[in-house]
Amino acid sequence: DSWRHWEMHPRGDEVVLCTEGAITLLQEHEEGIVRTHLSAGEYAINEPGVWHTADIANSATAIFITSGEGTEGRPR
């Protein structure tokens, strides 16, 4: 299922590695929403302070590596 919230990590980058299926990562920047499609084996970086969420059409598995300290969330 697609995420029901946005999140932001202020203290470090987050590596998002798709290991199975596919996801679309949405990142909120000043110029608008940037969508990045990830298939198995592909990764993206969420920079510190960037609000992000994800859409998942079917099913997917991903690994998230980040500094969780100070993480904020908000409804989508």
Enumerate the predicted regions with their spans.
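Double-stranded beta-helix
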Residues: T53-R76
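Short acidic-glycine-tyrosine-enriched beta hairpin
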Residues: H29-P48
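A generic "binding-loop/recognition-motif" signal
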Residues: R11, V50, N58
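Flexible, glycine-rich phosphate/dinucleotide-binding loops
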Residues: T24, G32, T71
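Conserved short histidine dyad/triad with adjacent acidic residue
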Residues: D1-P10
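Histidine-centered metal-chelating micro-motifs
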Residues: W3-R4, E42-T53, T71
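Glycine- and acidic-residue-biased ligand/ion/polar-headgroup-sensing regions
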Residues: R11-H29
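A cytosolic small-molecule/anion-sensing beta-strand core signal
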Residues: T19-E20, S39, N58
